[in-house]
A protein has these predicted regions:
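Peripheral, non-AAA+ core regions of ATP-driven protein-machinery
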Residues: 1-188
Length: 188
């Protein structure tokens, strides 16, 4: 809002992305949909030693969904956080209700647990099922184009969302299972 009225926001995704100089552990950028518009949102996770009763807190992500993702990580990727406090935050207070956030949340959690940041320019999206499968997200091509437009260079996406032709400036890694995605990011 200016003295002359409303002014458009050139890059709404900038509101939901942190301005870290270097990548930090526990951070993963997600391409979500707000209505029909792709929007980049940073997901932050902090995994810390818990007491006798570990806590699971989330802001912007449903708490029950977080508990389910932690169980899938343990069962299918061998990442145990059952005795740890786990905190997850969607930057900027945005509420993410679509399941396409699952993959980014899980990669942020494993990054925090290992204390190793994901590469600079990294994005991820995809639903993760209880059997560990990575399911496609709606409008995947639009999500990838938006990420490339904003300068992101590495994407981990469901195999069904992999484009038939390359997206300029974006290296796309298509995965079918959560353990495959975890192994991939560990090798980057």
């Amino acid at each position: 809002m200016t003295e002359k009225g409303l002014k458009g926001v050139a890059n709404p995704s900038a509101i939901f992305l942190s301005t870290h100089g270097d990548p930090v552990a526990g951070s993963c950028v997600l391409v979500t949909l707000e209505g029909t518009r792709p929007l980049l949102v940073e997901i932050q996770a902090l995994v810390d030693s818990g007491g006798p009763s570990p806590r699971r807190l989330s802001v912007g992500i449903e708490r029950d969904r977080l508990a389910m993702m932690l169980a899938v990580l343990h069962r299918h990727a061998g990442i145990a956080a059952f005795d740890q406090d786990v905190f997850v935050n969607a930057v900027g207070g945005v509420r993410i209700s679509e399941p396409a956030a699952d993959l980014a949340v899980m990669l942020a959690i494993q990054s925090s647990l290992r204390g190793k940041p994901l590469p600079r320019g990294f994005i991820a999206f995809g639903e993760v099922g209880l059997a560990g499968e990575v399911r496609p997200a709606p409008r995947g091509q639009e999500r990838l184009r938006e990420a490339a437009k904003l300068g992101f260079s590495i994407a981990v996406v469901p195999k069904a969302n992999a484009p038939k032709k390359a997206v300029e400036g974006l290296t796309i890694h298509a995965v079918e299972r959560i353990e495959e995605a975890i192994a991939l990011v560990r090798s980057l």
